[in-house]
Design a protein with these regions (language model features):
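Peptidyl-prolyl cis-trans isomerase
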Residues: 57-162
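Short, low-structural-confidence N-terminal segments
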Residues: 1-68, 118, 142, 162
Length: 162
């Protein structure tokens, strides 16, 4: 009797895992990095947290935006790793992160973490990684193009006085 019960339990666990594994599927493959439907759903929840107006869009449109966001992130990260020491700790990221959740209306990191968990979004570490990618990408673009930008300080000063 014990063996039969054990086999039934084992079989049910195996089939349950097999069924639950089929819930995840590949949406895209970018630079040998796989993006799954779970990744897109998490990104979608994150984007909705950043911009609640996204909730007014059709769900398929939100999914498309999230997928494109993830694809862009993978491409940016690959390029950034060629130029920057990506693993190096950057203290400015913590400052940007604090400003980030404060601008979203959260009083502290703990409240922000709770909402992230309830919305099935990213962890704080994952968000800091996203912030690092954006920060380094903006830094790269600035470094590449800052010499091309010319600001007429006299004209700007006159416009600010009006």
């Amino acid at each position: 009797m014990y063996k039969v019960l054990s086999l039934i339990i084992l079989f049910s666990l195996i089939t349950k895992n097999a069924v639950s594994e089929s819930k995840f599927y590949i949406i895209a493959k970018v630079n040998n990095e796989i993006i799954t439907n779970y990744d897109v759903e998490t990104e979608s929840n994150y984007l909705k947290l950043l911009n609640p107006n996204l909730n007014q869009l059709d769900e398929n449109k939100i999914i498309e935006i999230a997928k494109n966001s993830l694809i862009n992130e993978v491409i940016k990260k690959k390029q950034l790793k060629k130029i920057f020491n990506f693993e190096q700790n950057q203290p400015v990221i913590n400052k940007i992160f604090n400003d980030f959740y404060t601008n979203l209306g959260f009083l502290n990191e703990k409240d922000f973490k709770q909402v992230l968990k309830s919305k099935k979004s990213y962890t704080v570490l994952e968000i800091k990684e996203k912030i690092k990618i954006d920060f380094l990408w903006n830094k790269l673009i600035y470094n590449l193009h800052n010499k091309q930008i010319k600001i007429d300080k006299k004209k700007t000063f006159k416009q600010n006085q009006k």
